[in-house]
From Swiss-Prot:
Pfam families: HTH_16 (PF12645), Sigma70_r4 (PF04545). Signal peptide: none annotated. May have a role in bacteriocin secretion or immunity. InterPro entries: HTH_dom_conjug_TS-like, RNA_pol_sigma-70_dom, RNA_pol_sigma70_r4, RNA_pol_sigma_r2, RNA_pol_sigma_r3/r4-like. SUPFAM superfamilies: Sigma2 domain of RNA polymerase sigma factors, Sigma3 and sigma4 domains of RNA polymerase sigma factors. Induction: By UV irradiation. This is Bacteriocin UviA. Keywords: Antibiotic, Antimicrobial, Bacteriocin, Plasmid. The keyword Amino-acid biosynthesis does not apply. GO terms for molecular function: DNA-binding transcription factor activity. One of its GO terms (biological process) is killing of cells of another organism.
Length: 185
């Protein structure tokens, strides 16, 4: 049995030194991912440290949920791989939650700036902010094609005429952009 396996068993039994060992063992990974969020998501300078604390809490939860009875986990490589992938998933969840928090704060500030009677305007502005955020992962051409296609209800032939290119090229750009958007959502 590896030292990591023994410490995970001790950690699941509440041993503080084992928890400390596991945190130290994966500290490099945690430090890497605490900095991996987009700058737009950070609200202040303390967010990076908050990210680290959230990842440490996730690590402890992950370790406590490892099915240690499974003989596969006696192999240290399997344990490290399991923890690594679980931390990646936790990071993705944190990213989604921080985006939701950011949208909520932005919408609250918009709502406070616009009077109550202008609710449709607030919803229109909020949806435009969300669309612009989603399109940031695309190239300029991909953004244009998606905006023409879905926001302006243009056909691919019309977009090709506007951009001075072929319909097939527009279709290819649209499909590439949609794949990127699916991956980022």
């Amino acid at each position: 049995m590896s030292e990591l396996y023994k410490n995970i068993v001790l950690c699941q039994n509440g041993d503080k030194k084992a928890i400390e060992y596991i945190i130290n063992r994966f500290e490099i990974l945690i430090n890497k991912y605490k900095m991996s969020f987009l700058k737009e998501i950070h609200f202040n300078s303390y967010d990076i440290e908050d990210n680290k604390q959230d990842l440490i809490v996730s690590l402890i939860n992950i370790v406590n949920k490892i099915p240690i009875d499974n003989p596969q986990f006696e192999n240290e490589g399997c344990l490290v791989n399991y923890i690594y992938k679980s931390i990646l998933n936790s990071r993705k969840d944190m990213y989604i939650n921080k985006n939701i928090k950011r949208y909520f704060i932005e919408s609250q500030s918009l709502s406070s700036m616009v009077e109550f009677k202008d609710k449709p305007l607030v919803k229109y502005i909020e949806s435009n902010i969300e669309i612009e955020d989603m399109l940031k992962c695309l190239t300029e051409k991909e953004q244009k094609v998606i905006k023409y296609k879905f926001l302006n209800d243009k056909s691919e032939v019309e977009i090709a005429e506007i951009m001075g290119t072929s319909r097939q090229w527009i279709n290819r750009i649209k499909n590439t952009a949609l794949k990127k958007l699916k991956e980022n959502i």
